[in-house]
Design a protein with these regions (language model features):
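Residue-level detector of Asp-centered blade-edge/turn motifs that repeat once per structural unit
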Residues: 101-104, 169-170, 242-243, 356-358, ...
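Beta-propeller domains
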Residues: 297-398
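Loop/turn-rich, solvent-exposed surfaces of beta-rich toroidal or solenoidal domains
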Residues: 366, 408-448
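Conserved blade-ending motifs and adjacent loop-strand segments that build the rim/top face
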Residues: 405-417, 448-470
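Beta-propeller blade signature
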Residues: 136-145, 197-215, 262-265, 387-396, ...
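N-terminal secretory signal peptides and thylakoid transit peptides that target proteins
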Residues: 1-17
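C-terminal segment of N-terminal export signals and the immediately downstream linker at the start
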Residues: 5, 24-67
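Blade-level signature of beta-propeller repeat domains, shared across WD40, Kelch, NHL, RCC1
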Residues: 468-498
Length: 498
């Protein structure tokens, strides 16, 4: 089997990796500032795992992934294959997901489907239980053995749209996020091509957070209720503070600056086993040194890794706006953020994946770290930011925000998206969403990068998404989005830094 690495796919960057993860960074205690002397810092021996090699899929023998030697995987839940528990084909565009312990040693996965384009038959699954029969997104639930050699599957939410990332709750639910506010009052999506109809005929407002119980079994689909007080914007990911039930949320407005939000439910979700509507939405603002109030700052550029800010949480008075006739897609997407920005809310580039660990929220800015950018970018097509990615950390107890990593170039880290913390406290796993050679990569507690998995399907163009560890931390689950494949990956974790 031929060995392969990231450096075989992309030209090495001459930039310098600077990574600072101080003693406040949860599982990364003891990490000190690093400045490379001659170039990027990659973990020795690829994080202890050695080079990546082509590995056959235990499902059918096809070599879909490159992994460190000794690791195995099985694919399942593939797009357009029949769901086992109902007469529906598996939807595509697999994205964020979470894995929960279930009965008889099995696990349940609740998985997003980031489908957005008009669907000739509307929502997948039972239209009678769809939130919006015209909307093609939602979630499926899969019940599997830990290594996916036995699978059952069904629809657990339908009639939503652009279900991107999300997050697991401590009380056994999946929070799924709609990444567009297009709806009955703003039909024209930026995703619609020139040959598509002007009207998508949405019947409901969109751009919300929804909650899906992992206990929802086959035949138990219900019409979903959005948590409208958690905001109507381009939701990306969610993470829950188990101590308070507060929900932290990222926004990915692609061509414009985005915000980092907190929703404070009016109930105790850990007691009610659900998040109630009617709470308070807030946006994060940073307080510069010497100041006493938050000041609107651009955090996508000119930020040194290791920089820490005090923060303030700014109330959003109109979390669920109605869009006036004639409002453009871009204008509609920015309504909630612009209220927060006008009050001192921080400006980030494309906030995407997020994970809670040990009192800290780690979240990703996909195109942060570049030169200062404008709203929208001058070329009109690239995302706001122009960088290769940042990793931020919010300390809940100390109410501080720290830039813990910034990629200097595509050979180091290229457009990170979803993120998950290793249960062994050694690293975070990052899903790349770039144009070629996409990988699962690890950022260690010493600020070093190494490769863990390389896509060998469709010439590596397809992005990884939804990476998350199962109960016990021995199996890593991840999706290949456009091809619509889910993987269960396991092997000798103790050999290296994951």
């Amino acid at each position: 089997m031929a060995a392969i690495s990231r450096r075989d796919f992309l030209q090495k960057s001459a930039a310098v990796v600077v990574a600072t993860l101080g003693s406040t960074v949860g599982p990364f205690v003891g990490l000190s500032a690093r400045a490379a002397n001659a170039g990027p810092k990659f973990a020795a021996q690829n994080g202890g795992y050695g080079p990546l090699v082509a590995v056959r899929d235990l499902r059918d023998g096809v070599e879909r992934l490159f992994l460190p030697e000794g690791f195995q995987y099985r694919s399942f839940g593939v797009r357009n294959t029949p769901l086992t528990e109902e007469a529906t084909l598996t939807p595509g565009r697999h994205d964020g997901m979470a894995v929960f312990s279930w009965k008889q040693g099995k696990v349940r996965i609740v998985r997003n489907h980031e489908q957005t384009q008009p669907n000739p038959v509307g929502a997948f699954g039972d239209l009678g239980h769809a939130y919006d029969p015209a909307a093609p997104g939602g979630t499926t639930t899969l019940e599997i053995s830990p290594t996916a050699d036995a699978v059952s599957s069904w629809v657990s939410l339908n009639g939503t749209t652009f279900n991107c990332a999300g997050g697991a709750s401590p009380w056994g639910t999946w929070l799924t996020c709609e990444e567009t506010p297009n709806g009955v009052d703003q039909q024209r999506s930026f995703l619609i091509g020139p040959n598509d109809p002007d009207d998508l005929t949405y019947t409901q407002k969109h751009g919300y957070l929804f909650e899906v119980p992992v206990s929802r079994g086959p035949g138990e689909l219900e019409v979903a209720d959005p948590i409208v007080a958690a905001g109507r914007f381009a939701h990306e990911a969610a993470a829950v503070d188990p101590g308070t039930g507060d929900v932290y949320m990222t926004e990915d407005d692609f061509a414009y600056a985005s915000g980092f939000y907190r929703y404070r439910p009016p109930n105790r979700p850990d007691e009610d086993k659900r998040i109630a509507d009617g709470g308070a939405l807030q946006i994060l603002g940073v307080i510069p040194p010497g100041a006493s109030e938050p000041v609107t700052m651009d955090l996508h550029a000119d930020q040194a890794p290791g920089t820490t800010y005090r923060v303030a949480w700014i109330p959003i008075e109109v979390p669920d706006p109605e869009f006036a006739p004639g409002l453009s897609n871009d204008e509609a997407a920015r309504v909630v953020f612009q209220e927060g920005e006008s009050k001192g809310g921080a400006r980030f580039s494309r906030l995407e994946g997020m994970d809670y660990f040990d009192g800290k929220i780690f979240f990703v800015s996909t195109e942060g770290g570049g030169p200062f950018d404008s709203d929208p970018p001058p070329n009109g097509s690239a995302g706001f930011g122009g960088g290769y990615g940042q990793v931020w950390m919010y300390d809940i107890t100390n109410e501080t925000l720290t830039l813990v990593f910034e990629s200097p170039g595509p050979d180091v880290l290229d457009f990170p998206d979803n993120i998950t913390v290793s249960p062994r406290r050694k690293s975070v796993i990052l899903c790349e969403d770039s144009s070629a050679g996409n990988m699962l990569r690890a950022l260690t507690r010493d600020g070093l990068i190494f490769d863990f998995a390389l896509n060998n399907v469709a010439s590596g163009v397809d992005e990884f998404s939804g990476a998350t560890f199962g109960p016990g931390g021995q199996v890593l689950y991840a999706n290949m989005q456009a091809n619509g494949i889910t993987y269960a990956i396991w092997g000798p974790w103790s050999n290296g830094l994951i």
